[in-house]
A protein has these predicted regions:
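C-terminal structural segment of proteins
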Residues: 1-179
């Protein structure tokens, strides 16, 4: 069975695998992605997750909620077997900002994404003052695009900036056979 199920094989990375919806970044033994639409939005908006169990409550930043296979290959989140996610808190950090979400999928909004992106932008007079940009379905956790955020901050919000941001966002991608 696959690594995520406690086995010793990655069927998605085999040469004959149809691996169109798998990691473009940070692939290792496991090339599964976080196929969630809300995940990149929650990370971009700096949400926090309230988790309860019989021992009490803890709060985890959305960015730290999703777990890399290098930490524990059998889990995708920090939730333990007796944990319950009770609340998602979205601070007002990005209140008044422009928010953008885009998803590319084969069969429409109900399908797993090939990629999705969430962005919060604080714009004044056509210039980007601050940015929080996160891609989903490209690696095992939502991928914060810190270099892209730095690039667009201080630039005009226009097609040229978008082209530069897109080129930087895919730099370092290591596609598998079909993605």
């Amino acid at each position: 069975s696959c690594y995520r199920a406690g086995g010793n094989t990655c069927y998605a990375s085999a040469p004959e695998a149809v691996n169109r919806e798998h990691c473009l970044f940070e692939g290792n033994r496991c090339v599964a992605v976080t196929p969630s639409d809300p995940a990149p939005a929650l990370v971009a908006l700096e949400a926090s997750m309230v988790i309860r169990n019989s021992r009490g409550e803890r709060v985890v930043a959305a960015e730290d909620f999703f777990m890399k296979p290098s930490v524990d290959i059998t889990r995708m989140t920090v939730l333990e077997p007796d944990d319950l996610l009770t609340t998602i808190r979205i601070p007002n950090t990005w209140a008044g900002a422009d928010f953008y979400f885009e998803k590319a999928a084969d069969r429409g909004s109900w399908d797993f994404p090939m990629v999705n992106v969430a962005a919060a932008l604080r714009v004044e007079g056509g210039r980007i003052l601050a940015a929080s940009i996160v891609a989903g379905a490209v690696q095992c956790t939502p991928r914060r695009l810190g270099e892209v955020e730095a690039l667009v901050t201080g630039r005009d919000r226009n097609d040229e900036t978008a082209e530069l941001a897109g080129a930087l966002a895919i730099r370092g991608a290591e596609p598998l056979n079909y993605n």
